[in-house]
């Protein structure tokens, strides 16, 4: 990544996390999702999608950092987590680089190309 990427996350008009999930766009780079929101325990799951032409350029990491800032400032979220298919080495590396640590393993949890694969859970406790 050359230089720090400044990312602005934008939700669709009228969207809120009160429904349990929220998609935020970082156009033209991609989008991040908060889902499975648990307001009592102040945690949510994270999903991320990066447009193919912007991959491996630091945008995903910048999007995660922007999501973390928004999560603490707007929703008082304490913990973010992601469930990642074990064959997805790029995603595992991204979340590790962002400071997430592995906290669980789910056997035969996801179907990828018609095959069951394990999934790891990675989490980050936000300050």
Locate the predicted segments by residue.
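Acetyl-CoA-dependent GNAT
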Residues: 1-55, 125-127
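Conserved acetyl-CoA-binding loop-helix of GNAT-fold acetyltransferases
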Residues: 50, 56-73, 89-97
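Conserved GNAT acetyl-CoA-binding A-motif
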Residues: 73-83
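Conserved catalytic-core motifs of GNAT/GCN5-like acyltransferases
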Residues: 81-84, 101-118
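Conserved active-site tyrosine of GNAT-family acetyltransferases
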Residues: 95, 100, 122
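Terminal substrate-recognition subdomain of acyl/acetyltransferases
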Residues: 115-127
